[in-house]
Amino acid sequence: MEKLYNENEGMASNQGKMENEEQPQDERKPEVACTLEDKKLENEGKTENKGKTGDEEMLKDKGKPESEGKAKEGKSEREGESEMEGGSEREGKPESEGEPGSETRAAGKRPAEDDVPRKAKRKTNKGLAHYLKEYKEAIHDMNFSNEDMIREFDNMAKVQDEKRKSKQKLGAFLWMQRNLQDPFYPRGPREFRGGCRAPRRDIEDIPYV
């Protein structure tokens, strides 16, 4: 009798274990389903339903034993925090997405001329000489004393000299580049460097033997 009783207890305990093992699996399945639903809701942007599902999970957890309830409460709190963080990020995204729509509306109201990039508008064919000429004309309209007028004209003359010098430097630089490309480039008597070098003789200059 004792053996049968012990066996019955063993069977009952085994059945209890099996039920306990089956319950977590069944409990996990709704969580997986909830996560899939949450993903769908995230894609649709429905944050209100997320709060409802969290409340439903809390109600389900209260009906379960205390040991399981405590474990689930920790999980639900973590999930709730992650949902709150995710919801705040998602709420920020629609606002940022709404801005391009307002820009497109504003662009639709603007005339076609304003569609040209700003940098393209700023580019002009006016050179430094043109600007200096305009500045000379504008100086007469300004209320400058004679000394100030002289200073301004001196500054303009300096600018023109610097421009001319920079052009000369660029010309010399280009000349040097051409010499580097062709080491046998003909040089005049003033360009002798490090000894006497005869100018380059082309094929036509060589006498026929």
UniProtKB/Swiss-Prot annotation:
Subcellular location(s) per record: Nucleus
Sequence segments annotated as region (Disordered): 1-125
One GO CC annotation: nucleus
Location of N-acetylmethionine modifications: M1
Keywords annotated in UniProt: Acetylation, Nucleus, Phosphoprotein, Transcription, Transcription regulation
Residues bearing PTM Phosphoserine: S88, S96
Primary subcellular site in the record, as a coarse category: nucleus
Role played: May be involved in transcriptional regulation.
Family: Belongs to the TFS-II family. TFA subfamily.
Protein name: Transcription elongation factor A protein-like 4
Organism of derivation: Pongo abelii (Sumatran orangutan)
Source species taxonomy: Eukaryota, Metazoa, Chordata, Craniata, Vertebrata
Gene giving rise to this polypeptide: TCEAL4
